Curated annotation (Swiss-Prot):
Species of provenance: Gallus gallus (Chicken)
Biased composition (Basic and acidic residues): 532-544, 587-610, 634-645
Name of the featured protein: FACT complex subunit SSRP1
Function: Component of the FACT complex, a general chromatin factor that acts to reorganize nucleosomes. The FACT complex is involved in multiple processes that require DNA as a template such as mRNA elongation, DNA replication and DNA repair. During transcription elongation the FACT complex acts as a histone chaperone that both destabilizes and restores nucleosomal structure.
Classification of source organism: Eukaryota, Metazoa, Chordata, Craniata, Vertebrata
CDD domains referenced in this protein's UniProt entry, alphabetically: HMG-box_SSRP1-like (cd21994), PH1_SSRP1-like (cd13230), PH2_SSRP1-like (cd13231)
Amino acid sequence: MADTLEFNEIYQEVKGSMNDGRLRLSRQGVIFKNSKTGKVDNIQASELAEGVWRRVALGHGLKLLTKNGHVYKYDGFRESEFDKLSDFFKAHYRLELAEKDLCVKGWNWGTVRFGGQLLSFDIGEQPVFEIPLSNVSQCTTGKNEVTLEFHQNDDAEVSLMEVRFYVPPTQEDGVDPVEAFAQNVLSKADVIQATGDAICIFRELQCLTPRGRYDIRIYPTFLHLHGKTFDYKIPYTTVLRLFLLPHKDQRQMFFVISLDPPIKQGQTRYHFLILLFSKDEDISLTLNMNEEEVEKRFEGRLTKNMSGSLYEMVSRVMKALVNRKITVPGNFQGHSGAQCITCSYKASSGLLYPLERGFIYVHKPPVHIRFDEISFVNFARGTTTTRSFDFEIETKQGTQYTFSSIEREEYGKLFDFVNAKKLNIKNRGLKEGMKQSYDEYADSDEDQHDAYLERMKEEGKIREENANDSSDGSGEETDESFNPGEEDDDVAEEFDSNASASSSSGDGDSDRGEKKPAKKAKIVKDRKPRKKQVESKKGKDPNAPKRPMSAYMLWLNANREKIKSDHPGISITDLSKKAGELWKAMSKEKKEEWDRKAEDAKRDYEKAMKEYSVGNKSESSKMERSKKKKKKQEKQMKGKGEKKGAASKSSSSTKSSAKTMSESFKSKEFVSSDESSSAESKKEDSEDESGASPAQSSEDSASGSD
């Protein structure tokens, strides 16, 4: 066997970033060289305590644990390389390379185990995930929760920010499981610890974001905010800028600390720490350092004993420790003499401060916009009232900020400031126009162009012209719209007849001088009588045999009274639940007894159904025969009625034919007179009588034959 093993393209995970390198195993130990950073991990063979082989995202991985608790992980091995590594570990390190699979059940509950520098979350004996405690930057506790925050790697595309564990309470007295969990994490985590005494402490300072009162402890490398509910440790390296801003009432001061990354409270992130001070509040401050240390460290910026306004002391100490300048408002002065402008942003009102290199808005939510990231600004007239305007800022990234409800008196000062800073103004040249527009709205000018008024004037002119035309022709009655021929056609179409419109109706219409719209005749359609939909619903036959019950229902009917006696006063629903629980808990042998009873009941039911169906068939055949007989009788009666109708129709037809023949054969020279007409009528009457008698006799004979 070779004395060394070398592997290329092996990856090491560093705070979420996978760094490739070369891994070399020899008799002396394990060496990994990072290709990106050049960092070398050297693990002595005598320090190795355990080796684990497992399947990971990048193929297979090797996990090495040392005797002093350090853990090293290397990924990117092929499955075929296990035998080679296992033999090498046995031969040179006298260790068994154990195979362990990760749990992939997807459960979010399990057991947490602390081993060396690792926190392992296990389900049963299989680990789900592992957290290197050296990556933990913050550990905070809640009622039943522990939240871990992690150091970030700038090279990682996706980073794990925090993990929250729910720790259930235990019955043990004097042991808080949440606190015990947090202490296990903090003992190995790379968390900022408050070692030594604070340089100074400011008690009960009012904080607007995050809201509350906090004690601020100043340490050499970080700032500690201690409140009733939350604690924050803020390293000075995360402080970007400091602002000291006077309130508009000239009695208060804002001290703003800009942070990156922000502090977090639950899911809320605070990029700005805003403290509010009263100008009248004074303090005497003594630093917890001797004068030589103060002089050496701060080089005259601070002294051991200081006194003055509280906001001055806080800002002075922060400036010296953070080593950053404090930004104050520039030479901008508003209409009221203040260095800020009252406005609204989103749903809250606040103060906008024009600075020398940007704008800052306090306090809810705080916004800081630098001039170098502004694309352009825009002055817009207010939407609800003309006594205010909106100030819009659009950044080069496309983000838009709208500060609304700014008093119109501030417009001139703000416009001059923006112009002096050489910012791009989207609607440049509207300064004079905007001032003029306010005057016009205060007292409208006749020269102002109003599109709506112009349109109304045009409509008025058109109405006047139409009125003049109608008055000129009011004495004459015109019949241009009246067309008798067309009207006749309409009527003919509507009533489906050849009748023409009467002259009297036409005269009446012309007299009135108005043409009423013709009413359309309703076309009556012959509707067939609706057939009643007879739903043939088969009623349940009371004589039919009842369906058999299941094994559970047989058991329940037999044991219902027993359950009631065991649980007096139990409701119906609770009884059903209890019965279900008892049935589930019953052994298989006892259930088989009731299953047999259910099978017997089923067989009896099938037998009864066969007998019932045979009886039903005989009854149904009798019913069918009676129905057929009834239908035959109805048919015979219907045939008799039809014969009678035919006879009556034939008699009436002979009568009408005789009459038409007598009327049709008349000569052209025939002159009608009273006598002739009377004689003719008599003749017709006699003919009618003679024609009726034979018809009657024929009907009688027909009835006799029937």
